[in-house]
């Protein structure tokens, strides 16, 4: 039979998990009425105290866990640097795990970090993550937790994000400002929230400029790879739909598009303009240089650790912590792949 959690008691009574925890420990700052309600419900639901959570509160490991989809990804490497720098300043070590965009591996890594008794966990979800049971396990065990970039919106944790819809809309608006009238979108995988939001931003830009949305101009990736970009570039040319601009989910795929266009003699941006997302280093060395959206990776890492530290301190001192979301800014970086003479 599944054990009752503190969160379930808190949800039923309409109070915070921290208040439930304090009530069960007879803290003086919790009213007698609340204590009685918590204790009565705990007995009714056969709640068993989580000895792991108790131990975690009384003994720090000075270690945090970080789960990211790809270590070699230019964006994620920047986030890692920000987290490590900030963690070191505050006396913490970071255990870095790579999910390889696999939900099953991600679940195992969450379980590993819980068993390692880390003081907190920072995480960007894999592309396969379509449920949040393993994430709820982190919250049920009262482990401080911060999400960044690819997130589960409904999970009540702190988050560090960008406004992907707004950023995508601005990228497509740039193509329109450069004279593009028939714009394709190479979109990301189905599950990630940032993929969904960038697709919505693409549609919003079209609508704002009176350009009809054509679903046949949307090319969904099966994988976020260079090869996928090459494949879609071939398909776009073979279909010959008159596309004059392409907004690509991320720079790695966009570079594949440019590579094929270069190979077959398509002039960029004269024939087709291309803009990516994330401002990878490779976007500055390919010919033509790739226009993109600057995503502040290092700053995202710093902000993620700072939020986690704030929660870890509250957790240690048994203070109420209210999760919050930090939104960082983005900017369109216009380079040779879009700067055409209108």
Describe the residue ranges of each PLM region.
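Short helix-capping segments at alpha-helix termini
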Residues: 89-90, 141, 206-213, 239-242, ...
